[in-house]
């Protein structure tokens, strides 16, 4: 019994082990099915055929479990699916799930494309542009990747990283930095002049199981599922620092690295500073770059040095976390970690650690140098790849030109997208360009080889028709080119075989710079951007060339055989000579800049591609009729940015207007589409016309809403297309300022006007329309002309297709008819069309994804002559559509009401980060670094979860650990539950940030408020010395300091007394008076004190007394001088009078004679005599006396005067009269003055 127990236990253990193994095998077998799509084994294990099958299955099961674990963690950031509302139907729920899935796939594809190929985050406009293209089905995920891989920015990034490899001192190529070689076969029977373009190439990051197994095996052009290795960090990290050495004086010898002083100081500095870096992981070495003199003072030396770290050595602790987030598109806070993991994780504490270590070594006496820890600055951190060996590729076909694998990178990428089917039509672009974006550090051999490969033409024996797109750009980059508005491309004969294009970098410049023909000289032909998505022109679309003698100018790099074929077969199509002659003067000089934006090289396509399995449909060359007016207005900014965003779809057809229709078949189909419960009508039109179009057309129709028209050719079986989603936007979306869901119906009433005859151009362009692939075009609001054809008896909408390749303006003339009111139906023969204006409800919940809408922007010229003409421009500007509310009544739209963008404020608190005073300064490095970190964390998360997200702005950081105040702007209005949605998203972000990024965010500190309800001052870091002011127009809040306080470098407001210690001089006390500002309280002594605004004036008591006495004395002196001067003047007058009078002996007779003379009759003084009589009468009644003496008159006594008169011959009455006059003269001063006045007049 005792022996049986151990045996039983062993048997039971074997049984359990067997059952467990069986379950593992069955689980691996069940999970083996999805592993065919994507392999999770490493390339070494997947290609190792020596491993047993059972062991590989176990490894598959283990790796699958790990991947599923990561995918389950991924759900932390995104919710699983779309929430189902109780009011939704099954169809609506399914449609919402499909929309949600499509938006998620597009979002992740866009993020991965930007991160993989351009190594950066997409901008708002870029993200919106690619989301529209992806959601509308215009481009697929793989086509998007092909476009990004062939972009100029991607190639510049590759060249930049290749240039970094030449900076490393000594290292060898590794698998992580240099990719395996890929070989591409040359088609059988092809005579190629492409010098080694398809021999071999090396490209980082590309891997294939077939190439790893057998390097000599050819790889087909079919797209295969390849397991991509995770991107490894840079081989080396180089961090550049700058620090100041105190106690040293800079000399000119330190400029020369060969001087003894320079070498001595370098050795001393490295030996001392190296101690601070030895403890860091991955440290390799340090080198001094230069010594500089300090800018502020003369003492000290600024040392610029670089420290090298091993990127692989430090990945032990950080690479695991990076790999955890490698599959998470939304975690773009680690976007730079692929190249600089050390910088990202240690940049906030790196400077403090080094400065503290250096300072401690100096204090402990271990260092002879005295570095200033405050002057330590981290200038730059960059990753350096290991150098790779260049494999020289020799041409074995027809040339001895040797090139490197990096110079033919574009050709190898281009070859990947060529179809393996030999019957597929090949698209070829002859690119006569010469612009090369190679690295400045490239060698001369590489530059020579790249310039030699500018233009490569090869002949291929393919039976399928081909298409050649002519392109040209100016000779000098940034120069100006003559742009022909009406594109007139040359067409090759269908039998001319051409091969795929070969380009070394983005763009090229033709040495001649222009392509000339016999009719159009000194003009250039705007070419379509080179892309593998360009669709071919079939054989039957090429008109017969009877007299085609025009030759294409050859380039030095074209082969002679290709030049001869092009000379024979390229010419101007027949029937376009008149058009070319008419528009020869309509040229516009515009500047050209290199294509660096996303939209530059992208071209719409109709779903054709390598391995797509579709029949090859054809897009005909677009043509447009142009007027004779000369346009010299430069293109607008929005036009220059998006001119290459769409395929030119200019209508090459003859439109029938004024009812002159010979044979017209027009079918209008309106399909109703429902978004929720809101129907939106779309119009599709198929037309086949065989007439001409008058260029000038009269129209009195007001601007209408944008429509969509589908131009197709006349085919035997007319198919009706049913749309599930508009390619660009609904007809009109009206969103009122309120959030209530309303439906507005705009009825367009046609205005009846009589057709008037105007002079039309005699030149008509005959055009034949073969089979055409449907292409969607969007028209501006004013590009719609309503007509009614009498033969058909139904309304039709004739539209002119617009193209960004031309700026010609057409004047359309049409007779307007009044339509009778009938019940609105969706039948194609309705006479009154109703455009239903549906309110787009933009949900910002986690499960909703919105759509951005665009409309064409009309300039002032396009609205000109609205009374008799409607100007239509063939330029379509796709800009952001403003949110408008349209009136419900018919007629001309009176006005539009624009709704402002929604603003949401929120704040959160990070508890495991310490606040510093530098975070108050928005210009400090610490503030910018922290701001950039939060933007990289929050922007991708919010943009992927919120529809209509526009941008995020960090307003401020406040103390309290770290409180982040932010503001989010939305492009469109949002429902009232935006606060709740934002709160949920931020709450999930807090959880995710704590689990993945070691950020402890307090959930209870989350504060979310919408802009119309929130107080902007709440999210401003205004302290107690400032007040928050809100701009009533913009709603922006700003902190304004109180009087006496000042903000320096955007720091919180501080007192002037603290900011300016010398504000008060002479020991004055600075004080802040509320409402007045800073004042100085000056010192006061016993007999002295200071005064002035800053106490700058000294005053003492003796000095004041002296000044007072001096002032009094001065006043007295001045008064005395004035009195003395007046006395002198009076004395001088008396002296003059005395001199004028006679001597005393003759004084009496003169006095009497003067009185007598005064009494003589003078006719001029009769009035005075009458006055004298009145005096005599008054004085005759009163006795006369003299105040001096009664007996003395004029110095003589009364008796003496009487004796004098008696001795004369005067009568008694005369004597008596004269005596009275004398008495009056002596007693009355007024009379005396009167007498003296007349006496002076007589003299």
UniProtKB/Swiss-Prot annotation:
Domain EGF-like as annotated: residue spans: 1013-1054, 1055-1096
Domain of life: Eukaryota
Swiss-Prot/TrEMBL GO biological process terms: extracellular matrix organization; protein localization; retina morphogenesis in camera-type eye; visual perception
Biased composition (Polar residues): 221-230
Result after altering residue 255 to H: Decreased-binding affinity to hyaluronan
Basic and acidic residues bias: start-end ranges: 748-762
Compositionally biased intervals (Low complexity): 207-220
Membrane side Cytoplasmic: residue ranges: 1128-1243
Domain SEA: 235-349, 900-1013
Keyword Hydrolase: no
GO MF term list: heparin binding; hyaluronic acid binding
UniProt-listed SUPFAM superfamilies: SEA domain
Tissues expressing this chain: Expressed in the retina (at protein level). Expressed in the pineal gland.
Region (Hyaluronan-binding motif involved in chondroitin sulfate C-binding): 1083-1091, 1139-1147
Keyword Metal-binding assigned: no
Signal peptide per UniProt: 1-27
Disulfide bond sites: 1017-1028, 1022-1039, 1041-1053, 1057-1070, 1064-1080, 1082-1095
Ranges in the topological domain labelled Extracellular: 28-1106
SMART domains per the UniProt record, alphabetical: SEA
Major localization class: membrane
Residues annotated as glycosylated: 225, 297, 316, 366, 427-429, 582, 701, 704, 712, 817, 888, 945, 959
Segments of this protein annotated with the region Hyaluronan-binding motif involved in chondroitin sulfate A- and C-binding: 1128-1136
Region of interest called Disordered, as start-end residue ranges on this chain: 205-234, 748-768
Hyaluronan-binding motif involved in chondroitin sulfate A-binding: region residues: 255-263
Described purpose of this protein according to its UniProt entry: Chondroitin sulfate- and hyaluronan-binding proteoglycan involved in the organization of interphotoreceptor matrix; may participate in the maturation and maintenance of the light-sensitive photoreceptor outer segment. Binds heparin.
Protein's name according to its UniProt entry: Interphotoreceptor matrix proteoglycan 2
């Amino acid at each position: 019994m005792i022996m049986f127990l151990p045996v039983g236990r062993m048997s039971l253990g074997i049984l359990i082990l067997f059952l467990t193994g069986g379950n593992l095998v069955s689980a691996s077998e069940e999970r083996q099915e999805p592993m065919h799509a994507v392999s999770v084994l490493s390339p070494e294990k997947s290609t190792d055929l020596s491993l047993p099958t059972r062991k590989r299955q176990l490894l598959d099961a283990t790796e699958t479990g790990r991947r599923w674990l990561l995918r389950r963690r991924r759900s932390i950031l995104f919710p699983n699916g779309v929430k189902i509302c109780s009011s939704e139907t099954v169809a609506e729920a399914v449609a919402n799930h499909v929309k949600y899935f499509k938006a998620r796939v597009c979002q992740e594809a866009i993020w991965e494309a930007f991160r993989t190929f351009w190594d950066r985050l997409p901008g708002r406009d870029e993200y919106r542009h690619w989301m529209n293209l992806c959601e509308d089905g215009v481009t697929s995920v793989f086509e998007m990747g092909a476009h990004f891989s062939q972009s100029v920015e991607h190639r510049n990034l590759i060249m930049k990283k290749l240039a970094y490899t030449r900076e490393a001192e000594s290292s060898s190529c590794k698998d992580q930095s240099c990719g395996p070689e890929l070989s591409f076969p040359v088609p059988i029977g092809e005579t190629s002049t492409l010098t080694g373009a398809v021999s071999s190439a090396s490209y980082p990051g590309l891997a294939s199981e077939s190439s790893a197994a057998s390097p000599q095996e050819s790889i087909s052009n079919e797209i295969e599922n390849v397991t991509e290795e995770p991107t490894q960090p840079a081989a080396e990290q180089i961090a550049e620092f700058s620090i100041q050495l105190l106690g040293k004086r800079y000399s000119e010898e330190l400029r020369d690295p060969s001087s003894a002083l320079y070498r001595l100081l370098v050795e001393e500095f490295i030996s001392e500073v190296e101690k601070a870096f030895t403890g860091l992981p991955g440290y390799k070495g340090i080198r001094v770059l230069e010594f500089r003199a300090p800018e502020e003072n003369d003492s000290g030396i600024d040392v610029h040095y670089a420290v090298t770290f091993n990127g692989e050595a430090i990945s032990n602790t950080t690479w695991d976390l990076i790999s955890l987030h490698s599959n998470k598109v939304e975690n773009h806070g680690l976007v730079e970690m692929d190249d600089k993991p050390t910088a990202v994780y240690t940049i906030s504490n790196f400077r403090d650690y080094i400065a503290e270590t250096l300072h401690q070594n100096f204090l402990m006496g271990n260092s002879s140098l005295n570095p200033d820890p405050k002057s330590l600055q981290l200038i730059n951190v960059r990753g350096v790849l290991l150098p790779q060996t260049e494999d020289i590729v020799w041409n074995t076909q027809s040339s001895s030109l040797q090139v490197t694998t990096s110079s033919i990178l574009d050709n190898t990428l281009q070859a990947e997208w060529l179809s393996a089917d030999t019957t597929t039509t090949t698209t070829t672009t002859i690119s006569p360009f010469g612009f090369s974006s190679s690295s400045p550090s490239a060698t001369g051999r590489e530059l020579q080889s790249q310039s030699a490969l500018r233009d490569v033409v090869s002949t291929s024996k393919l039976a399928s028709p081909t298409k050649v797109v002519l392109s040209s750009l100016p000779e000098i980059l940034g120069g100006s080119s003559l742009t022909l508005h009406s594109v007139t491309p040359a067409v090759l004969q269908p039998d001319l075989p051409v091969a795929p294009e070969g380009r070394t970098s983005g763009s090229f410049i033709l040495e001649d710079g222009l392509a000339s023909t016999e009719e159009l000289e000194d003009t250039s032909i705007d070419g379509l951007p080179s892309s593998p998505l360009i669709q071919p022109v079939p054989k039957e679309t090429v008109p017969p060339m009877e007299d085609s003698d025009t030759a294409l100018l050859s380039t030095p790099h074209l082969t002679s055989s290709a030049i001869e074929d092009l000379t024979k077969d390229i010419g101007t199509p027949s029937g376009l000579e008149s058009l070319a002659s008419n528009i020869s003067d309509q040229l516009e000089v515009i500047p050209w800049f290199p294509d660096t934006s996303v939209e530059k090289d992208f071209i719409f396509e109709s779903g054709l591609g390598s391995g797509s399995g579709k029949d090859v449909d054809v897009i005909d060359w677009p043509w447009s009729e142009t007027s004779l007016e000369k346009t010299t207005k430069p293109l607008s900014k929005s036009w220059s940015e998006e001119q290459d965003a769409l395929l030119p779809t200019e209508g090459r057809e003859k439109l029938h207007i004024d009812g002159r229709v010979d044979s017209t078949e027009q079918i209008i189909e309106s399909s109703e589409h429902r978004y929720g419960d809101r129907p939106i009508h779309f119009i599709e039109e198929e037309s086949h016309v065989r007439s001409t179009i008058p260029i000038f057309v009269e129209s009195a129709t007001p601007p209408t809403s944008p429509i969509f028209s589908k131009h197709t050719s006349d085919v035997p079986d007319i198919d009706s297309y049913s749309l599930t989603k508009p390619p660009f936007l609904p007809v009109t979306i009206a969103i009122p300022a309120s959030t209530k869901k309303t439906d507005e119906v705009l009825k367009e009433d046609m205005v009846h006007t009589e057709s008037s005859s105007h002079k039309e151009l005699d030149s008509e362009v005959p055009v034949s329309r073969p089979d055409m692939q449907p292409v969607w075009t969007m028209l501006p609001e004013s590009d719609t002309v309503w007509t009614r054809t009498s033969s058909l008896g139904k309304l039709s909408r004739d539209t002119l297709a617009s193209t960004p390749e031309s700026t010609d303006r057409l004047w359309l003339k049409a007779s307007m008819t009044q339509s009778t009111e009938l019940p609105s139906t969706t039948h194609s023969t309705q006479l009154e069309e109703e455009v239903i204006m549906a309110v787009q409800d933009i949900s910002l919940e986690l499960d909703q994804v919105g759509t951005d809408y665009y409309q064409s922007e009309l300039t002032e010229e396009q609205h000109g002559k609205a009374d008799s003409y409607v100007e239509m421009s063939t330029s379509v500007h796709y800009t952001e559509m403003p949110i408008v509310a349209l009136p419900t009544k018919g007629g001309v739209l009176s006005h539009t009401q624009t709704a402002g963008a929604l603003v949401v404020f929120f704040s959160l608190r990070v508890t495991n980060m310490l606040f510093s005073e530098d975070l108050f300064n928005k210009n400090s490095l610490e503030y910018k670094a922290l701001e950039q970190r939060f933007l990289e964390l929050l922007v991708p998360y919010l943009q992927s979860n919120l529809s209509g997200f526009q941008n995020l702005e960090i307003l401020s950081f406040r103390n309290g650990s770290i409180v982040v105040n932010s503001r989010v702007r939305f492009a469109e209005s949002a429902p009232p539950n935006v606060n709740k949605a934002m709160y949920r998203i931020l709450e999930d972000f807090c959880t995710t940030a704590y689990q993945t990024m070691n950020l402890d965010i307090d959930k209870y500190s989350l504060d979310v408020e919408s802009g119309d309800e929130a107080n902007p001052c709440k999210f401003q870091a205004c302290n107690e010395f400032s007040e928050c002011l809100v701009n009533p127009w913009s709603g922006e809040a700003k902190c304004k300091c109180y009087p006496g306080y000042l903000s320096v470098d955007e720091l919180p407001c501080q007192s002037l007394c603290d900011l300016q210690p010398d504000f008060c001089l002479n020991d004055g006390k600075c004080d802040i008076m509320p409402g007045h500002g800073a004042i100085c309280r000056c010192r006061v002594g016993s007999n002295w004190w200071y005064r002035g605004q800053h106490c700058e004036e000294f005053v003492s008591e003796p000095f004041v007394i002296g000044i007072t006495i001096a002032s009094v004395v001065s006043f007295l002196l001045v008064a005395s001088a004035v009195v003395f001067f007046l006395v002198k003047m009076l004395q001088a007058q008396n002296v003059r009078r005395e001199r004028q009078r006679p001597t005393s002996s003759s004084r009496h007779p003169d006095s009497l004679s003067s009185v007598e003379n005064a009494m003589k009759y003078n006719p001029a003084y009769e009035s005075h005599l009458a006055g004298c009589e009145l005096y005599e009468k008054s004085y005759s009644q009163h006795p006369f006396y003299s105040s001096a003496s009664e007996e003395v008159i004029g110095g003589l006594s009364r008796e003496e005067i009487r004796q004098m008169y008696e001795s004369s011959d005067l009568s008694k009455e005369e004597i008596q009269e004269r005596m009275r006059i004398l008495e009056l003269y002596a007693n009355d001063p007024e009379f005396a003055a009167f007498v003296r006045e007349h006496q002076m007049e007589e003299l």
